[in-house]
């Protein structure tokens, strides 16, 4: 092979001033291609025939072959190499090949560029690869094996500990006695407890205990053996090997046994540690329950029949995937909540985190840090993680009492090692081997195997409120004396490096004096007496003798000893970046889209903190969505109050301790629904707090609380009366609404559909496809509301709007969801925050629009002025609304309605007229701002999403086998332009919505009540989807008296009420003789939808257009349906059902397009049609 050095008689030195040569030299220097020039070699005429020696040419010949375009290519190559990113649209590789092909085969520089190209191509891939296909690499093994696919036993449970630092300093053969060291340097004086300087709570140290025992469990038989894996795989919960793992699994549906954890050792720690593990157990069970419901890509298809192998695979796939997700949340808590608190980042408004999983790009100037290489923990870090000085006073007492009882009444501070460990052995063996039979802190298991929430929450609340101890000398509780003595003996038996050797190993400066270790003269003098030289101080207990770090904001929050502070960060990076399941295999495909999202951090919430998800999934019925206890449990609440006040965020959180939310009772019969929803005195609406949150002014005033749906007081009724006066519908206006919506629907079909296929003779039949929910139904509703309220919507005509179609719908949907669909406590904090921002932004634009019109129509005053001068200026002319639709169109040859001009004049000006009427109706002496947030914005929020849901469910019914028989007749009616045909279509719409719609409305019970209820319908045993009930032939016999206590909640299931044969005869059939005002999906009673007379026209108009499409059908496969699941409430543990035995409710949950989250409404469904 040719040498890479320059040689031969043709070689000459290039002058530094020679620009082309200088360029190649610089390029070579960057690319690492050039070596030192070699002297010319002699010409030997008798060289072997295959000698690698051949003549090479220099830059002179290269320049003769290249042009300016080639120089540009080299510059581009250099830039790409430095950045590590190649924009292939610039065809760099192809241009480089063109350049190289021009150079002579003997070109020295050409060879070097070629070598650089080969190096770059080689480094594009991992060598060797770190991830692999195959079932054995798909999930975490119970014992941690196969994490490194090339060294499968690296870090496996039962391995020997590794050694980090080389011990070279001569060890004193007669070191000080561990008992003396503990009594003088480590023991805590009970009267001199030092609270943690940063007011860190005990919960952080409980979490640290889980981490420590996740990766360190020393064998009592052979202290060089680690009984657990070297990975953060939650082995205290899941077990250290397959046998232990099986003991905690339910072996059904991927579940863990309720409220269990595998490790017996955990029962020897304060009960808060066990509660945290139970919370992870509950999170796991929530996740696997959700995975089974969603069944992403049919990967968790439930077997049918008695195929044992299939059922075992189903259970295992769910369990293992759930474990990956739960460990994903665990590691995110470690990296964000835990490490941010350690670094005091929780005290500043910054979302920066130390995340070892960062995706490093490959470039000329740097190479990515290796990842997924595995890990094996070392003895040094086993000693680093002994943080007994952080034990709180309460936990000191608990541990002392527990050990005293285990020792038969003897003080643990005076117990000998044999006595101590004999007692611990007896204590551990006193717990049953079956995790489900164990108790915790005196709590007893319920019938379903779980613990009562209140007992667990009490332990956790007290732990959050209990400040931990400070690091530093003389602060380890006396009850830990035997444990610490054992630790020192183990460190000596392991022959670990000294404190200075370890510090040097991790890159820290060696201590030169004892005062460098700790400036406290007492501590320094004791160290000098024990060791004689700083270089001789043992790692353990040396790290306990170090002075703790000061509080630095941000930078130092845990305030550990200096060596510990640096070491734990290195270890965190190593544990995470070396773990295949946290790096190269931590993907949505492996965790599912839902699982990946469920474990993910969101920097817009708590600057990335994620532990609130654990709290809300474990205890969904106790913590408020903004509870400081759930969002920041690693610092005591009183200190969190100071932190949040300094950041201006104190009002964002609730400072109340957790308490159980009111119990909810389901009401099903139509008669009971009518009774409750018409009784405003004893049953109150519950949306006032949410509406008020969205509309509250910074100054404290809150006009939204007076809105119609915010309460049942006279002021709320007055708001409804005002709103009803503003929503007028003369016959001519109804026609214009219909025309507007039909034209808008045709325009949306034209704008957002795609031609996907040509077929038939001469390919003249064209097939079109569109997402009918996302791009038609949702946007038609958004455009209508934008027109009615003069909202600033952009159009294709270039109108000066603010929101696109989809942006407007998302904003309206967000606001609606925060008021009416806020039932997932783990998502509520972000939902409410985003909805308030959307409300304030849109409200400010509406207010600005009204103020601008005030300069034209003097009936409008400045936003802070009273509205008192009532004129008809706007009604007599009106400015153009922000959102104008298109109507008067015609159908072109492609079956899509074309633009035909402006919207009908009356609807076009109706938006401004509506605003004027609402402001005037709001009352004398009120400002425009009050009217906007007290009446206009809440009324805007109350509509769009509900109509989208109703229409989507109706269309789905008629496109299913259940309702398809009606399509031909509906299509015929849709082709007719008569009022009768339109009204008949409306009846079809209402019937389809009644059969498929899912609506339930809550009420707060204001006084003790009794209600007669019954069960109108039952699940069809032949229907696995639970979509189709059957009428209950013994409905009357199921009548029962429901006792409702003051302060409890009722959920009136209007879905079941819509299938009640006493109100809707033949409830499962489409009948066109029902009264349109009898339907329940707009609500019942005084809070029934105020605008139902209007929206029934808008919905029918959209429905009519869709029915006119030729060959209307679903798109192929799953794209043509929306995934619908029976709705169920998560109550903290699998199988736990609150209240009565569940019946058919008809309520459904949906999933979004990528199946990463649940939704209250269908979001996507693609349809096709031909022309």
From Swiss-Prot:
An MF annotation (GO) of this entry: iron ion binding
Catalyzed reactions per annotation: (9Z,12Z)-octadecadienoate + O2 = (8R,9Z,12Z)-8-hydroperoxyoctadeca-9,12-dienoate; (8R,9Z,12Z)-8-hydroperoxyoctadeca-9,12-dienoate = (7S,8S,9Z,12Z)-7,8-dihydroxyoctadeca-9,12-dienoate
Active site, renumbered: 385
UniProt keyword terms in alphabetical order: Calcium, Dioxygenase, Heme, Iron, Isomerase, Metal-binding, Oxidoreductase
Coiled coil location: none
Binding-site residues, Ca(2+): 214, 229, 231, 233, 235
SUPFAM superfamilies according to UniProt: Cytochrome P450, Heme-dependent peroxidases
Biased segments, Low complexity type: 1-22, 881-895
UniProt keyword Transport, yes or no: no
Name this polypeptide is given: 7,8-linoleate diol synthase
Source species: Pyricularia oryzae (strain 70-15 / ATCC MYA-4617 / FGSC 8958) (Rice blast fungus)
